A protein has these predicted regions:
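Short secondary-structure boundary/capping segments
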Residues: 34, 43, 145-146, 217
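Short, flexible helix/strand-to-coil boundary loops that buttress conserved ligand/catalytic motifs
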Residues: 4-7, 139, 166, 210
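Interdomain motor-coupling "hinge/lid" segment immediately C-terminal to the ATP-binding subdomain
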Residues: 1-88
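Accessory nucleic acid-recognition modules appended to NTPase machines
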Residues: 53-195
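Catalytic cores of nucleic-acid endonucleases
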Residues: 193-196, 210-249
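Conserved catalytic cores of phosphodiester-cleaving nucleases, focusing on short active-site segments
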Residues: 184, 199-215
Length: 249
């Protein structure tokens, strides 16, 4: 909603997750009334809505993002940690690899081979990138948070980074899940990785993230479940438009 205000002057309210899950049809209708179709604005946000310098020119946006990443890895991180130039280059390579991942439980040993490092060092690198707020490491609620516990999913910090970094073309599932996790965690919600479904919110609400035809089958076994769907303007029942997560506070 902040992006819509800054770029277009639309002043729309923000909502809690509880308000969205209870009243998503009414909320989506009120947004659609003002925007006609929210989906083109949503696609814009996914490409260049996460940082305020989109107003300085969209051609420069991706270049500015790359500059910020390089500055964080080349200057900020070495000031805080003892990091070699070789490690800096591997951190950059790791970000590129993550940008092109299909969302799934990563094979950490295979990732380490790709980055030309060892498994323990790769886990430490993932921790460093998470501390720098460049990635989000999603962990299982049952395994606990430990540096040596591999994350169940690794996503970049926001969708703009995915689109800016991926050279082969991004995976739509990666974009969707990155956006969802970004918005949910920014709203202060606790998100862990469930055995089925994509996200477990506050250890009780099971969330599945997908396209507009995404079925409820993966999460239907769980009493408290919702599907957030892309390409959907107005939802129904437990099927909620994904873009509504952009109105969380």
């Amino acid at each position: 909603s902040e992006f819509l205000k800054l770029k277009y002057g639309f002043d729309l309210p923000a909502y809690t997750f509880e308000e969205i899950q209870s009243n998503h049809i009414e909320i989506a209708r009120s947004i659609k009334q003002l925007l006609e179709s929210p989906l083109p604005y949503f696609q814009e946000f996914l490409s260049y809505g996460s940082y305020p310098f989109f107003n300085e020119g969209l051609e420069e946006y991706s270049y500015r993002l790359q500059q910020i990443l390089n500055f964080i890895i080349d200057y900020d991180l070495p000031e805080a940690k003892d990091i070699s130039v070789s490690t800096q280059n591997k951190l950059k390579k790791l970000l590129y690899v993550i940008s092109e991942l299909v969302p799934f439980t990563p094979n950490v040993s295979k990732l380490a081979t790709q980055i030309e490092t060892t498994r323990p060092i790769l886990l430490e690198m993932l921790h460093i990138l998470e501390e720098a707020r460049l990635i989000r490491n999603l962990r299982s609620a049952t395994k606990g948070i430990s540096l040596m516990n591999k994350p169940e999913k690794i996503l970049l910090s926001n969708a703009n980074l995915v689109k800016s970094l991926s050279e082969k073309g991004w995976n739509s599932g990666n974009i969707r899940e990155t956006f969802a996790l970004d918005q949910l965690q920014n709203a202060g919600l606790t998100i862990t990785h469930p055995s089925k479904g994509d996200f477990l919110l506050n250890e009780e609400v099971l969330l599945e993230i997908g396209g507009k035809n995404k079925a409820l089958t993966q999460v239907a076994h769980h009493e408290n479940h919702f599907v957030f769907s892309d390409e959907l303007e107005i939802g129904w029942g437990k099927q909620i438009p994904l873009y509504l997560l952009g109105f969380l506070y």
